[in-house]
Amino acid sequence: MTKQELLKTHFGYDTFREGQEAVIDALLAGKDVLAVMPTGAGKSICYQVPALMMKGITLVISPLISLMKDQVRSLNQVGISAAYLNSSLTQGQYFTALRYAKAGRYPIIYVAPERLTTEAFLDFALSADISMIAVDESHCVSQWGQDFRPSYLKIAEFVAQLPKRPVIGAFTATATKEVREDIARLLGLQNPFCTTTGFDRENLYFAVKTPKDKYKEVHDYILEH
């Protein structure tokens, strides 16, 4: 299916949101991506759609167990096989998921960054055809950010061990210039396509008023709205 057909069939949208198609096209062309898109802008579609168009496996690295579960549940509900690998699984469940992954059952696998360097996961990754790595909450790699997680620093080391370098997409909702530079450097992005979208909300505006009677102004505003 084309990207438009996948968008409609699995996600129910007729058109892409701002920035999504450019990111998808870059990933499909084999270019690394650094995308800064606000919460609710549809970052997940930016890697889920190309994941379904690539031949191999897409690993989605996420620090949040609850988010992994929600994403996998949503994908399974629309007919997309996906799994997550994190500490919420029992040992038996974890190794069963890895066995299914080796058999090619899942085009999309969510994994916690702490799992990347474990012996069992590395054994899987070194023999798997990993076509793309999507790093969610990628600002966690930067010590400039308030959500720094040392486990994110292992991502580049993990990628370096793979027999074939996959395309890498780094996604975050917010990042300063320093954090963006850290993301690109610490994840080893190669000449990435960079985009920042969605922060100009036409339905929102800021205004400053200096009324003589503040209480009347507030009272009238409440009555009006």
Q: Where is each model-derived feature located?
A:
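Conserved pre-motif I regulatory segment
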Residues: 1-38
